[in-house]
Swiss-Prot record:
SUPFAM superfamilies: DNA repair protein MutS, domain I, DNA repair protein MutS, domain II, DNA repair protein MutS, domain III, P-loop containing nucleoside triphosphate hydrolases. It comes from Baumannia cicadellinicola subsp. Homalodisca coagulata. GO terms for molecular function: ATP binding; ATP-dependent DNA damage sensor activity; damaged DNA binding; mismatched DNA binding. ATP binds at G617, P618, N619, M620, G621, G622, K623, S624. SMART domains: MUTSac, MUTSd. This is DNA mismatch repair protein MutS. Keywords: ATP-binding, DNA damage, DNA repair, DNA-binding, Nucleotide-binding. It holds the Pfam family MutS_I. The keyword DNA damage applies. NCBIfam families: mutS1, PRK05399.1.
């Protein structure tokens, strides 16, 4: 936008002077300028909007000697166009006519009433109902980072102080803010430069004293000590900037933001950005939601429950009491979920409705939904009255409450199915206000009055074609046919002439018309006052209602987990203080439901005596699935969920790390190997003896010597220095000698059987190292031409005859070369490789199914 001086503004028309004065205060956003029944955009805003939302670009006369580019939308279509612009990361200032048009010269008074930005949305049509929409602020200095997030649709205000780049990256990955504020003095933008919704803010908005003052005013306190954040200076500075921005955009009080929480890393099982991505918790590696843990686990019946479940998955708790409370509640609800879930479904998104109530932007149907939600509470209390699961569920029910008086008020005040918008009327129920009933009766009884008047006039004039009608342009009228119009009495005043009829008005009908129109206008005005008064009556209950909504969301999550445990045959894990991960017959929670045949369960046993497993075996043999499934089982256990296994005992876990798969980071200019090494470095710097670490094929992105050396050194460091609980998958068979050199390491492998040109994967983990990698067999299965496979086989034979120092794999005897012409039965070969003493009953049964399919 071109800069305008005070003097140059005076060259414009009065209306455009007003526009420029308002636009100067909101130069960085699109200005929707209300003119009658339209929102208009001018100049550069009009040009940009016409491109972004495909509306016509035209001109609105001249001002200051230049044509005025203009584009506009109907006022009733505002929400749909806002949704498009916000999805594109744009912010919009809504400028309304707040004054009354008068006979005085000059434009009607206008004022920006709110600014819609990606991080401050509250209207349901603009939001993804099952995903948090966060506004965030970030600040960095030598001590680390300050980070604050606000969900304006719930009032959830959270701060943290990530200690380094990796921790901050993990927070951004987890929270995925729709809008991110950062100081204009921050020059290193590597962490955020490719994120959406970036907003530069002046550094003075991050000033500590101002931030503390802002927060104390918001919470109505004289100190921040009660929130436990008074020493978190970086977090406070970020929170202060964020709160000021929210106030600037909302232009109204925000009473639902009544507390602030400092999140500490030691309270949660920490997962870095790579781990959350690789485990595909909420999004798959392609960015979609199919085949993710959430896709399997989220059968919640309310949107607020769905959002809470995602927060649990992204921040598993380390508090054993919380975990045990959830487990006990799930166990109890396994006998109730089929009745409870249909009731909870009627609750709706109470959390976000209450935010709109707090912002005074609640629409009539929001109040109807609050009423409908409150009507379900007695049924919930009655159903769970026999709770035997302990104090946690009892406390949840106490927080849910009853709200009988509030429910009765809304039942009396709001019609069953109110209109969508207040301006359409028909919201306040009959009987709630006597004056409103009388005004409505005057308008609604028009038919009876007009029927009587029509009969009276027809009798008085003797004109059989006389009718009384109404249209929006001319109002009420008496209509006569053209043939009888010449007999109209003198008191009939012609109002409209049509081809076959004449229309008239008489003083009595005109007087009644004025009375009806006035009554409708008065009724609508009174209805608005009653509605505003109703909001005032609801606001004192806001804190209690928010507490109830949070409890209802948790009930939804717990009943959902109870249903999932029952349907998917999950068991309750035991969480204890011993250094152990013992999972019997574990199953992958995402892969298992996708399979048409039984999933082959596998066992994991890690402890302080055996804290690393070197896993070998062919590609597609099940190594990655096995590692991911165990990480997901541990994660599920730490959110309090039941898990897919026949038994699980899990000790203290402080972090989960994954180094699984990689691709070039083209945006940052990092190769696959560089990505792999960066993630590995993070693990080696931050893992502890209580961490679960998954390492898949470290070193494959470089030369054999380099890769093997790095893999060896990483495994040695994890096993002997860090002593982390580690699953280490590799194709470097040299690593299988590590158990002979370092205490705490054991070998395991996934078996496969070759037969002619095919390979059969057993998908069952067994003790000991694999005897070969089966690379050529897998290549053949993938469709590599037969002559290429034969050439590769010859080359492999040559390489195996070289010294061990240059071998690409563990040297194999000539008889262990790929047997593409072998005629031995695959069933016999499989039986030869099986160690029956190492198989659990479940594994033996699964193996039997696999052998039967090979016959």
């Amino acid at each position: 936008m071109k800069e305008l001086t005070d003097k140059s503004i005076l060259n414009h028309t009065p209306m455009m002077q007003q526009y420029w004065q308002i636009k100067a205060q909101h130069s960085d956003v699109l200005l929707f300028y209300r003119m009658g029944d339209f929102y208009e955009l001018f100049y550069e805003d009009a040009k940009l909007a016409s491109q972004l939302i495909d509306i016509s670009l035209t001109k609105r006369g001249f001002s200051a000697g230049e044509p005025i580019p203009m584009a506009g939308i109907p006022y009733h279509a505002l929400d749909s166009y806002l949704a498009k612009l916000v999805a594109l990361g744009k912010s919009v200032a809504i400028c309304e006519q707040v004054g009354e048009p008068t006979i005085n010269k000059g434009p009607v008074e206008r004022r920006v009433v709110r600014i819609v930005t990606p991080g401050t949305l509250s209207d349901e049509v603009l939001l993804n109902e099952r995903q948090d929409n966060l506004l965030a602020a970030m600040l960095q200095d030598k001590q680390g980072f300050g980070y604050a997030t606000l969900d304006i649709t719930s009032g959830r205000f959270i701060v943290s102080e990530p200690k380094d780049f990796e921790a901050m990256a993990a927070e951004l990955q987890r929270t995925n803010p729709a809008e991110l504020l950062y100081p204009d003095t921050q020059h290193n933008l590597a962490l955020i430069e490719h994120r959406r919704g970036l907003r530069r803010r002046p550094i003075w908005e991050f000033e500590l004293d101002t931030a503390c003052q802002q927060l104390m005013i918001q919470f109505g306190t004289s100190s921040l000590k009660g929130f436990g954040i008074e020493c978190a200076h970086l977090a406070l500075r970020a929170a202060g900037c964020l709160l000021q921005y929210a106030k600037d955009t909302q232009r109204t009080a925000m009473p639902h933001i009544s507390t602030i929480t400092l999140e500490r890393q030691e309270d949660y099982v920490v997962m870095d950005a790579a781990t959350m991505r690789n485990l595909e918790l909420t999004h798959n590696l392609s960015g979609g939601i199919e085949h993710t843990l959430v896709a399997v686990l989220d059968h919640t019946v309310t949107s607020m429950g769905s959002r809470m479940l995602k927060r649990w998955l992204q921040m598993p708790t380390k508090h054993l009491t919380t975990i045990e409370n959830r487990q006990q509640s799930i166990y109890f609800l396994q006998g109730k979920f089929d009745i409870l879930q249909p009731i909870l479904r009627k609750i709706g998104d109470l959390e976000r409705i209450l935010a709109r109530l707090a912002l005074r932007s609640a629409r009539p149907r929001d109040l109807a939904r609050i009423r409908n939600a409150l009507q379900q509470l007695p049924d919930i209390q009655s159903l769970l009255a026999d709770n035997t699961s302990g104090m946690h569920l009892s406390q949840l029910l106490s927080n849910v409450g009853y709200f009988d008086n509030l429910c009765q008020l809304l039942e009396r005040a709001i019609v069953i199915s109110p209109s969508a918008l207040l301006r359409d009327g028909g919201i306040i129920a009959t009987g709630y206000n006597l004056e409103l009933d009388e005004l409505r009766a005057l308008a609604n009884n028009a038919t009876d009055y007009l029927d009587i008047l029509e009969m009276k006039e027809r009798k008085h004039t003797g004109l059989e074609t006389l009718k009384i009608g109404f249209n929006a342009v001319h109002g009420y009228f008496i209509q006569l046919s053209r043939e009888q119009s010449h007999r109209a009495p003198k008191r009939y005043i012609r109002r409209q002439t049509l081809k076959h009829v004449e229309r008239y008005i008489i003083p009595e009908l005109k007087e009644y018309e004025d009375k009806v129109i006035t009554s409708k206008s008065k009724a609508l005005s009174l209805e608005k006052k009653l509605y505003d008064a109703l909001l005032d009556m609801l606001l004192p209950y806001l804190t209690q209602l928010q507490l109830s909504a949070t409890a209802l969301a948790e009930l939804d999550v717990l009943s959902n987990l109870a249903e999932r445990a029952d349907t998917l045959h999950y068991v309750c894990p035991m969480i204890n203080n011993q250094p152990i991960i013992n999972i019997i017959d574990g199953r992958h929670p995402v892969v298992e439901p996708l399979m048409s045949k039984p999933f082959i369960a596998n066992t994991l046993s890690l402890s302080d005596q055996n804290h690393m497993i070197i896993i070998t075996g062919p590609n597609m043999g099940g190594k990655s699935t096995y590692m991911r499934q165990n990480a997901l089982i541990v994660l599920l256990a730490y959110i309090g969920s039941f898990v897919p296994a026949s038994q699980a005992i899990i000790g203290p876990i402080d972090r989960i790390f994954t180094r699984i798969g990689a691709a070039d980071d083209l945006v940052s200019g990092r190769s696959t190997f560089m990505v792999e090494m960066t993630e590995t470095a993070n693990i080696l710097h931050n893992a502890t003896c209580q961490s679960l670490v998954l390492m898949d094929e470290i070193g494959r992105g470089t030369s054999t010597y380099d890769g093997l050396s790095l893999a060896w050194a990483c495994a040695e460091s994890l096993a002997s220095r860090i002593k982390a609980m580690t699953l280490f998958a590799t194709h470097y068979f040299e690593l299988t000698t590590l158990p002979n050199k370092i205490k705490g390491i054991v070998n395991a492998h996934f078996a496969a059987i070759e037969y002619n040109d095919t390979i059969a994967f057993m998908h069952s983990i067994q003790n000991g190292a694999a005897n070969k990698s089966y690379g050529l067999s897998v290549a053949s299965l993938a469709g590599i031409p037969r002559d290429v496979i034969k050439c590769a086989s010859r080359k492999l034979h040559e390489l195996e005859n070289l010294s061990n120092n240059i071998a690409l794999t563990t040297p194999l005897s000539s008889r262990s070369l790929p047997q593409f012409t072998q005629e031995t039965s695959p069933v016999i070969q499989a039986l030869q490789e099986i160690d029956p003493d190492s198989l659990s009953p479940r594994q033996a049964l699964d193996l039997l199914y696999s052998l039967k399919q090979m016959i």
